[in-house]
A protein has these predicted regions:
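Short, solvent-exposed secondary-structure boundary/capping segments
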Residues: 119-126, 173-182
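Catalytic-histidine neighborhood of serine endopeptidases
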Residues: 65-68, 74-119, 129, 144
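A conserved glycine-rich beta-strand in the N-terminal activation segment of trypsin-fold
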Residues: 19-23, 45-48, 52-82, 107-108, ...
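Sec/Tat signal peptide C-region and signal peptidase I cleavage site
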Residues: 12-17
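Catalytic nucleophile loop of clan PA
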Residues: 72, 186-207
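Bacterial N-terminal signal peptides
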Residues: 1-10
Length: 219
């Protein structure tokens, strides 16, 4: 896919729905992270009356971090997320964007290596990557109509995997400079920046945006 080529990485035939091999799941989980920002220690604003914080979900009101997206490892201390996920954290009252693994360990971002506003991706390093530096294998020639899996931090509730089909390629709207991948696996707020995997657990794209009117999403 053009998107994977644009990342500088090494982009499915018709298939019926199939589950990922359970043996792949620990590796996928180890290579997938939440993008988080630390909540401020104190609220700089004052309010006329106490806020009804008890109406927020328990996880949201007790977590010390805001969960804003998903990222994943591609090896050699290189990580990928959607460009708009990191941009959302710029000039924020919250802490800088960081990665959090399934065990709750948080890793500060080191250096931005590549960034594309148009294609909406960023490649970066971590200041101190996790031990083992787990990475997803890459498939650069996916075929249409195969089962795919959207991996992400859906709704900020932790990393989940949802299946669908890689349905079509859609030209970029302004001048068709590249093609977006469209897929039917469910995508929710927080999925942005997560990996789109084929049936073998290999990376074929980056989940970027949800279609407003139908369950055909973009990578």
């Amino acid at each position: 896919m053009l998107l994977l080529a644009g990342l500088g990485l090494a982009g499915m035939s018709a298939a019926r729905a199939a589950s990922l091999d359970p043996a792949m799941l620990p590796k996928i989980q180890a290579a997938t992270f939440e993008v988080v920002q630390a909540k401020p220690a104190g609220d700089p604003l004052s309010y006329e009356r106490p806020l009804p914080l008890e109406q927020l979900p328990y996880q949201e009101r007790t977590d010390k971090y805001y969960s804003i997206g998903t990222a994943f490892a591609i090896g050699h201390n290189r990580y990928v997320t959607a460009g708009h996920v990191l941009l959302a954290g710029a000039d924020s009252l919250w802490g800088p964007p960081e990665l959090r693994d399934a065990a709750g360990r948080v890793y500060p971002i080191g250096k931005i290596e590549k960034f594309s506003l148009g294609k909406d991706f960023v490649v970066f390093t971590l200041a101190q990557p996790p031990a083992g530096d787990a990475a997803l294998a890459i498939e650069t020639s996916p075929a249409l109509n195969q089962v795919v899996y959207a991996v992400g931090n859906a709704l900020g509730t932790g990393v989940v995997i949802r299946d669908g089909l890689y349905t079509s390629d859609t030209p970029e709207q302004e001048n068709g400079a590249w093609k977006w991948m469209r897929f039917s696996a469910a995508a929710s707020p927080g999925n942005s920046g997560g990996p789109l995997l084929d049936k073998d657990g290999k990376l074929i794209g980056v989940v970027l945006m949800k279609s407003a009117n139908e369950n055909l999403n973009y990578a």
